[in-house]
């Protein structure tokens, strides 16, 4: 195919005719593609050569390994601003009600004493949280989150300074806070299950009658009756326990 293309090209340009060309084995140069390509190709390039790739990771960082910019960059005629010294700056008064103080104790110290870490109450029970509203549970949850953040901050500072005290009290306090969080999750899970079951009943076509609704409201509103016998037994048990104490 290459020999045919060269021969046809010479014939079209008015060169040697097909009859005047010698055979290929006598003049192989006439039939080679390199001769035709080299005659048309220039020996130099007019396009600018691309810039060499700079493989230095320290260009512009180190004074020894830097190579400088590859192209001229604009420079502003205005000087760079200089930072003011701390002595010239006005001291702002500390805000005692700032939200970041919640990461510290009441005395606003990074590491509380073991007595302060141990001075806490018990965890909220599930029975107590069932009586709370959605807003109360929401507020209580974020109170526990802030308390755990405060405990984590004190643990970090205690470990950084190698204080050597307060780890046991902080762990007990964190366990109490986590118990409250588990109780909140349990109550919310119960309410979600109740809502899901009510939704399935409603979608299934169940509609409570007005009498059933009134009975449920009266049962929840009225307190449970206590028999006199139960009161007598409770008073007797209290007197016996007081005597034992």
UniProtKB/Swiss-Prot annotation:
Regions crossing the membrane: none
Highest taxon above the source species: Eukaryota
Any GO BP annotation: mitochondrial translation
Gene Ontology CC terms: mitochondrial large ribosomal subunit
Protein's UniProt keywords contain Transit peptide: yes
Alphabetic keyword roster: Mitochondrion, Ribonucleoprotein, Ribosomal protein, Transit peptide
Residue ranges of the region described as Disordered: 36-98, 207-245
Chief site of localization: mitochondrion
GO molecular function annotations of the record: structural constituent of ribosome
Compartments reported by the entry: Mitochondrion
Pfam family, one: MRP-L47
Compositional bias per record (Low complexity), positions renumbered to this chain: 36-49, 234-245
Oligomeric form and interacting partners: Component of the mitochondrial large ribosomal subunit. Mature mitochondrial ribosomes consist of a small (37S) and a large (54S) subunit. The 37S subunit contains at least 33 different proteins and 1 molecule of RNA (15S). The 54S subunit contains at least 45 different proteins and 1 molecule of RNA (21S).
Family statement drawn from the similarity comment of this UniProt entry: Belongs to the universal ribosomal protein uL29 family.
Name the record gives this protein: Large ribosomal subunit protein uL29m
Natural source organism: Coccidioides immitis (strain RS)
Gene name of the encoded protein: MRPL4
């Amino acid at each position: 195919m290459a020999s045919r293309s060269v021969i046809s090209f010479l014939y079209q340009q008015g060169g040697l005719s097909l009859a005047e060309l010698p055979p290929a084995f006598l003049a192989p140069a006439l039939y080679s593609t390199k001769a035709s390509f080299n005659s048309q190709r220039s020996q130099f390039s007019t396009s600018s050569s691309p810039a060499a790739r700079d493989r230095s990771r320290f260009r512009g960082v180190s004074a020894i390994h830097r190579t400088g910019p590859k192209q001229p960059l604009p420079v502003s005629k205005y000087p760079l601003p200089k930072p003011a010294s701390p002595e010239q700056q006005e001291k702002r008064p500390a805000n005692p009600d700032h939200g970041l103080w919640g990461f510290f104790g009441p005395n606003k110290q990074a590491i509380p004493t073991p007595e302060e870490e141990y001075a806490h109450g018990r965890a909220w029970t599930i029975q107590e949280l069932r009586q709370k509203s959605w807003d109360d549970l929401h507020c209580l949850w974020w109170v526990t989150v802030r308390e755990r953040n405060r405990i984590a901050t004190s643990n970090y500072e205690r470990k950084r300074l190698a204080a050597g005290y307060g780890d046991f009290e902080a762990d007990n306090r964190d366990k109490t806070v986590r118990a409250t969080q588990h109780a909140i999750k349990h109550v919310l899970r119960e309410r979600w299950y109740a809502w899901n079951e009510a939704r399935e009943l409603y979608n299934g076509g169940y509609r409570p009658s007005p009498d059933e609704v009134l009975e449920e409201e009266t049962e929840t509103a009225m307190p449970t009756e206590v028999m006199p016998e139960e009161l007598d037994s409770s008073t007797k048990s209290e007197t016996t326990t007081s005597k034992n104490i």
